Amino acid sequence: MIGLIQRVKWAKVEVEGQTVGEITQGLLVLLGVEQGDDQAKADKLLEKVLNYRVFSDEQGKMNLNVQQAGGSLLVVSQFTLAADTNKGLRPSFSRGAAPQEANALYEYFHQQAARKIHTQTGQFAADMQVSLQNDGPVTFWLQI
């Protein structure tokens, strides 16, 4: 399971011109589900996302996690994170989980996150437009 996290001042996701998820300060989490992923991996990734210290403290050091910084999560599914780009000029998505399995784990990740922190989401398998203002920029690839 892959989480590409970006520290943001704000982020929102739209589907067909309608905002379906929006946060102010926090983390945009682009979530990629791979074959073999399960709820245990989702739990482990969520704990890492929630505890990863990417927000600055009073001395300007990255010592605070999203909860300590008073932030939120915007979780957006992104199957392209599971792409294999090693061969040729077209990505292969053979490592990605089947859509039904990926959706179930995406929803599970969202539900578990929402129990711990204010969380918004995109819409699984939709054509989404994601807007954000990076803060830093600060971006990390987390893989479980």
From Swiss-Prot:
Q: What is known of its domains?
A: A Gly-cisPro motif from one monomer fits into the active site of the other monomer to allow specific chiral rejection of L-amino acids.
Protein family membership: Belongs to the DTD family.
Gly-cisPro motif, important for rejection of L-amino acids: where is this motif?
Answer: 136-137
Q: Which reaction does it catalyse?
A: glycyl-tRNA(Ala) + H2O = tRNA(Ala) + glycine + H(+); a D-aminoacyl-tRNA + H2O = a tRNA + a D-alpha-amino acid + H(+)
Database matches in CDD domains: Dtyr_deacylase
GO cellular component, alphabetical, reads: cytoplasm
Q: What is its EC number?
A: 3.1.1.96
Against NCBIfam families, the record matches this protein to:
D-aminoacyl-tRNA deacylase
**Where does it reside?**
Cytoplasm
Would I find Cytoplasm among this entry's keywords?
Answer: yes
Quaternary arrangement and interactors, per the entry? Homodimer.
Molecular function per GO: D-tyrosyl-tRNA(Tyr) deacylase activity; Gly-tRNA(Ala) deacylase activity; Ser(Gly)-tRNA(Ala) hydrolase activity; tRNA binding
As recorded in Swiss-Prot or TrEMBL, the protein's gene is named dtd
Could you identify this protein by its name?
D-aminoacyl-tRNA deacylase
Q: What class of enzyme is it?
A: hydrolase
Q: Which Pfam families match?
A: Tyr_Deacylase
Biological role stated in the UniProt entry? An aminoacyl-tRNA editing enzyme that deacylates mischarged D-aminoacyl-tRNAs. Also deacylates mischarged glycyl-tRNA(Ala), protecting cells against glycine mischarging by AlaRS. Acts via tRNA-based rather than protein-based catalysis; rejects L-amino acids rather than detecting D-amino acids in the active site. By recycling D-aminoacyl-tRNA to D-amino acids and free tRNA molecules, this enzyme counteracts the toxicity associated with the formation of D-aminoacyl-tRNA entities in vivo and helps enforce protein L-homochirality.
Q: Which SUPFAM superfamilies match?
A: DTD-like
**Major location category of this protein:** cytoplasm
Q: Say if the entry is tagged with keyword Repeat.
A: no
- The record lists the membrane-crossing segments as none
